Protein backbone atom coordinates (compact mmCIF):
# COMPACT_ATOMS: atom_id res chain seq x y z
CA UNK A 1 0.00 0.00 0.00
CA UNK A 2 1.35 3.46 -0.82
CA UNK A 3 2.35 5.92 1.89
CA UNK A 4 0.13 8.89 2.61
CA UNK A 5 -0.18 11.96 4.79
CA UNK A 6 -3.52 12.79 6.41
CA UNK A 7 -4.32 16.49 6.93
CA UNK A 8 -7.31 17.61 9.02
CA UNK A 9 -8.27 21.29 9.49
CA UNK A 10 -10.08 21.87 12.79
CA UNK A 11 -11.96 24.49 14.75
CA UNK A 12 -13.78 23.77 18.03
CA UNK A 13 -14.47 20.17 17.12
CA UNK A 14 -15.97 19.43 20.52
CA UNK A 15 -14.74 16.74 22.87
CA UNK A 16 -17.32 14.05 22.05
CA UNK A 17 -17.11 14.51 18.28
CA UNK A 18 -13.31 14.69 18.26
CA UNK A 19 -13.01 11.57 20.41
CA UNK A 20 -15.40 9.83 18.00
CA UNK A 21 -13.21 10.91 15.06
CA UNK A 22 -10.01 9.63 16.66
CA UNK A 23 -11.65 6.38 17.76
CA UNK A 24 -12.70 5.69 14.13
CA UNK A 25 -9.26 6.82 12.90
CA UNK A 26 -7.45 4.36 15.18
CA UNK A 27 -9.48 1.48 13.73
CA UNK A 28 -8.32 2.17 10.18
CA UNK A 29 -6.49 -0.76 8.58
CA UNK A 30 -4.20 1.64 6.75
CA UNK A 31 -2.55 4.33 8.87
CA UNK A 32 -0.86 7.45 7.49
CA UNK A 33 2.84 8.08 7.47
CA UNK A 34 1.96 11.39 9.10
CA UNK A 35 -1.17 12.96 10.64
CA UNK A 36 -1.24 16.76 10.57
CA UNK A 37 -3.90 18.75 12.42
CA UNK A 38 -4.18 22.43 11.46
CA UNK A 39 -6.28 24.23 14.04
CA UNK A 40 -7.85 27.68 13.74
CA UNK A 41 -7.19 28.66 17.38
CA UNK A 42 -9.91 26.50 18.91
CA UNK A 43 -11.15 27.59 22.33
CA UNK A 44 -12.25 24.10 23.39
CA UNK A 45 -10.19 20.94 23.97
CA UNK A 46 -9.54 20.31 20.26
CA UNK A 47 -5.75 20.74 20.48
CA UNK A 48 -5.43 18.84 23.78
CA UNK A 49 -7.29 15.86 22.38
CA UNK A 50 -5.37 15.98 19.10
CA UNK A 51 -2.05 16.13 20.95
CA UNK A 52 -2.67 12.67 22.39
CA UNK A 53 -2.62 11.29 18.84
CA UNK A 54 -0.07 13.45 17.03
CA UNK A 55 2.57 16.07 17.72
CA UNK A 56 2.02 17.54 14.26
CA UNK A 57 -0.36 20.33 15.22
CA UNK A 58 -0.22 23.69 13.49
CA UNK A 59 -2.15 26.56 15.07
CA UNK A 60 -3.33 29.51 12.99
CA UNK A 61 -5.51 32.48 13.87
CA UNK A 62 -9.14 32.30 12.74
CA UNK A 63 -8.49 35.23 10.40
CA UNK A 64 -5.81 33.17 8.60
CA UNK A 65 -8.25 30.39 7.75
CA UNK A 66 -9.36 29.79 4.20
CA UNK A 67 -10.08 26.41 2.73
CA UNK A 68 -7.25 26.23 0.20
CA UNK A 69 -4.60 28.26 1.98
CA UNK A 70 -5.03 26.43 5.28
CA UNK A 71 -4.61 23.06 3.60
CA UNK A 72 -1.60 24.31 1.63
CA UNK A 73 0.04 25.56 4.85
CA UNK A 74 -0.33 22.11 6.40
CA UNK A 75 0.90 20.46 3.22
CA UNK A 76 4.04 22.61 3.27
CA UNK A 77 5.03 21.01 6.59
CA UNK A 78 4.31 17.44 5.48
CA UNK A 79 6.91 14.74 5.03
CA UNK A 80 7.20 13.27 1.56
CA UNK A 81 4.61 10.58 0.89
CA UNK A 82 2.97 9.04 -2.16
CA UNK A 83 -0.41 10.67 -1.51
CA UNK A 84 -2.11 13.31 0.61
CA UNK A 85 -5.59 12.82 2.05
CA UNK A 86 -7.52 15.87 3.25
CA UNK A 87 -10.42 15.28 5.63
CA UNK A 88 -12.53 17.48 7.86
CA UNK A 89 -12.95 17.10 11.60
CA UNK A 90 -16.53 15.95 11.19
CA UNK A 91 -15.87 13.32 8.50
CA UNK A 92 -16.16 10.16 10.59
CA UNK A 93 -14.90 7.01 8.86
CA UNK A 94 -17.80 4.75 7.88
CA UNK A 95 -15.76 1.56 8.23
CA UNK A 96 -12.27 0.37 9.18
CA UNK A 97 -11.20 0.17 5.52
CA UNK A 98 -12.19 3.71 4.51
CA UNK A 99 -8.65 5.05 4.00
CA UNK A 100 -7.58 1.86 2.26
CA UNK A 101 -10.57 2.13 -0.08
CA UNK A 102 -9.76 5.74 -0.91
CA UNK A 103 -6.15 4.91 -1.75
CA UNK A 104 -7.04 1.79 -3.75
CA UNK A 105 -8.76 3.99 -6.34
CA UNK A 106 -5.34 5.29 -7.35
CA UNK A 107 -4.45 1.84 -8.70
CA UNK A 108 -6.25 3.03 -11.83
CA UNK A 109 -3.66 5.13 -13.68
CA UNK A 110 -6.47 7.35 -15.03
CA UNK A 111 -7.36 8.52 -11.51
CA UNK A 112 -5.63 11.71 -10.38
CA UNK A 113 -7.91 12.79 -7.52
CA UNK A 114 -10.60 11.25 -5.35
CA UNK A 115 -13.31 12.86 -3.25
CA UNK A 116 -16.01 11.32 -1.17
CA UNK A 117 -19.40 12.33 0.02
CA UNK A 118 -20.36 12.84 3.61
CA UNK A 119 -23.04 10.55 4.94
Model regions and ranges:
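Short, well-formed alpha-helical segments that are part of the catalytic scaffolds
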Residues: 13-27
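Short, acidic/glycine-rich phosphate-metal binding loop used to engage nucleotide
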Residues: 12, 59-67, 92
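Short beta-strand-to-loop acidic/aromatic patch adjacent to the donor-nucleotide binding site
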Residues: 81-92
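Acidic donor-diphosphate engagement hotspot in glycosyltransferases and nucleotidyltransferases
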Residues: 46, 71, 95-99
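A conserved acidic beta->alpha catalytic loop
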Residues: 39-47, 91-92
